[in-house]
From Swiss-Prot:
The gene is CCK. This is Cholecystokinin. This peptide hormone induces gall bladder contraction and the release of pancreatic enzymes in the gut. Its function in the brain is not clear. It also decreases food intake and regulates gastrointestinal physiological processes. Keywords: Amidation, Cleavage on pair of basic residues, Hormone, Secreted, Signal, Sulfation. The keyword Metal-binding does not apply. The precursor is cleaved by proteases to produce a number of active cholecystokinins. Residues 21-48, 122-130 form a propeptide. One of its GO terms (biological process) is axonogenesis.
Amino acid sequence: MYGGICICVLLAALSVSSLGQQPAGSHDGSPVAAELQQSLTEPHRHSRAPSSAGPLKPAPRLDGSFEQRATIGALLAKYLQQARKGSTGRFSVLGNRVQSIDPTHRINDRDYMGWMDFGRRSAEEYEYSS
């Protein structure tokens, strides 16, 4: 009980002292405080670490020049060609395995390693006498 009262008094003292401080808008003309406030209000851009696939090339900036647009167009065309070729890497193995399954197989959407339909299994294990 005594500990709860001490915590309430401490919180009240902290809230009163924080109300007595300067508002966030006034910085007394300090350039460091103004820079800090500006950095806090700007949206942050988080960058991801490069993947292990290889080094990344810096993307060209769009200044509206014809050469840069042509470069981006060529990169887009190359990407679309690769996308049309199909999947590569780990997904190609999965695609080959799914294609080798009998075409009359009824549960293609649930075929992955380790999947088991427990309802069907339990119904097959127990023979019901009627």
